[in-house]
Amino acid sequence: MPYAIGIDLGTSNSVVSVIRNGTAEVIPDADGNRTHPSVVSFGHGQNPIVGHKAVGLMNLNPQGTVYSSKRLIGRATDSEEIVRAVNSVPYDIVPGDHNDPRIRVHDRVYTLQEISAHVLRYLRGLAENYLGEPVQHAVITVPAYFNDNQRQATRDAGEIAGLEVLRIINEPTAASLAYGLGQDRDEYAAVYDLGGGTFDISILRIMGDVFEVVSTAGDTYLGGDDFDQAVMDYMLAHLSEEYQRQVRRSPSARLKMRRAAEQAKRDLSDVEETRIKVDGLVKDERGYEQAFTSALTRIQYNQIVFPLVKRTFEVCDEALTAARCTPGDIGALVMVGGMTRSLIIQEAVENYFGREPAIGVNPDEVVSVGAAIQAENLLGAMQGSGGGTGTLLIDVTPQSLGIATVGGFCERLIERNSAIPTGTSKRFTTSADGQSEVKIEVFQGEARMAADNEKLGEFILQGLRPAPRGDVKIIVYFDIDGDGIVNVTAEESETGQAAAIRIEASTGLSAEEVKDLREDLNFDNLGF
């Protein structure tokens, strides 16, 4: 049987794993690194460089080196998150054809799907070099709170990279697979997942080989990048107004400060005080370069980032309430993501749940290992080989789904934390006399008003029979597949006139665009 890989496509770093001879193996690069920066650097007319080599180019090519792109994918250009990113990254973010953010580098504009595809193709190349044979199949993980737009954009990126994406699964769920595999457990588990760009908490019931997600909650714009930004803001506050303006105008200076802030954050898990120094950050009135220096203690750092830590527990409260659990009901605590190595996070999480996290779980690698387990299961089932572990994974949809109705309200058809795959239907009527068509607008979120939720897409059911308002009955069917991706059908109940849509993200690419990008992109020399 061919191999199928599991990919944790992270904001800061990515990991790729495989199950070989019944054992999980995390795949290294040529230098032995098992985590690979999700960084893509574009030179003038050159092939892009990915991974650790790309990180080495960040200072030399700040406007051509793209990082943290996962925070942007699947969002609308005018969203709060994109507006915030435009002011914090050194590369250019520009609006695309579908109101999607794109990256302009030198004389070319790239979709976020292309950026992620370069990272995925790099990881696929590492796997092929490691295994000595072509790799075609993969399971890719996403944050549990990713919406339909973001999930589809990630699947599109996998297809552009030449992968057959067997499944998109949630990161905390993948982590639980790796944690509980082959162990006779019957307990509730909490997976606290704080990565570089996102935070998720999932509550699961593990019963032998059955993994049932009971609830999930998250914040797709809360992660290590925000902790770095908080330290950067502290550093900026120690500069004069003129020097602050210089830093904000200079992509190179902002990048230097970001990397210094990130290093200070890491240092303070091991020492009580660190000294931050950034050479050549600004220029004085005579044009001479000046360094930035400042001391930062662990106590100061904890005070700076406390609001961010508190936000994670507000999300935890939400997930536990939805699961009808308390922290004391949790029998196992799994911590995932590089930020959980931070001392303040470890102490705060242990205090909140009243227990220590599970040992033997590498927070950087566990998601990828879980994805590899699921990849082997799915490929074995698809090919009828009987391979895999025989585990049953029951996941949920993280946010409610519904349609816009008269008055601008959102009528929910599928509630959040519903087990997937799932489907449902609901009957509606026309709202005007002689109405010949109806527009179905699909939204995801918990707000009562449709405009306050995330719009996933729309389609029109035409050819309705002429009748007074309320006489024509329309049945709307919702279906969510195993990837958490939405399909919607509307049908006039009497005539059978129907229209259907596999919701294409309003900010996403068409199937034809994905196909063209897959054929056009040059994946040679990505820096394996």
Where are these regions (language model features)?
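Oxyanion-binding/catalytic loops of NTP- or PPi-dependent enzymes
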Residues: 1-87, 92-99, 104-113, 118, ...
